[in-house]
């Protein structure tokens, strides 16, 4: 049942490796330190079954930790052994999975040993306020000097009926900083000594951003 758990990691960047056939494969490097079970939720007490995982344990004197974190958080972490984590993520699991773990348990990349495919969830890179040509791939207007518009969206309405633009149409707006999940990425290598995982292809986020790694649904590892 521990296969239902997700791990919190950090995107370290990308690199190239050679596969068994001699092909050069682009891989994303994810570092995963020990994840701590910070809270257990059950259907009887919370309405659903879930496991809250914590990562990036704070290494600082006790007095410093008391100044930086609220008493509510310190009391929350005290129930799981007192290790304060900077990142908390919740994973919805089955009732059997909740019963198979305990508060304060630590998990690492060993739960992905032998897994062939994983799903990576993270926050995509922010690109600021963008126009419709960059965000949606609009063609734009004529490029000649006499044109009145070059990168505008153009007309998005109709005639006198309905006499308005329907809500939800494509407009210039903020781009990026979205929660993105890339599914079914191939696991190239799991290095337990260095606590890193190599997955084929790109994953969302910038270098140093937090990602969540979980076993792909419907794929046997």
UniProtKB/Swiss-Prot annotation:
Keywords in alphabetical order: Ribonucleoprotein, Ribosomal protein, RNA-binding, rRNA-binding
One Pfam family linked to the record: Ribosomal_L3
Biological process, per Gene Ontology: translation
GO molecular-function terms, A-Z: rRNA binding; structural constituent of ribosome
Repeat as UniProt keyword: no
Domain of life: Bacteria
CC terms in the record's Gene Ontology section: cytosolic large ribosomal subunit
Role summary: One of the primary rRNA binding proteins, it binds directly near the 3'-end of the 23S rRNA, where it nucleates assembly of the 50S subunit.
NCBIfam families for the chain: L3_bact
Subunit structure: Part of the 50S ribosomal subunit. Forms a cluster with proteins L14 and L19.
UniProt record similarity statement: Belongs to the universal ribosomal protein uL3 family.
Name the UniProt record assigns to this protein: Large ribosomal subunit protein uL3
Species assigned in the record: Chlamydia trachomatis serovar D (strain ATCC VR-885 / DSM 19411 / UW-3/Cx)
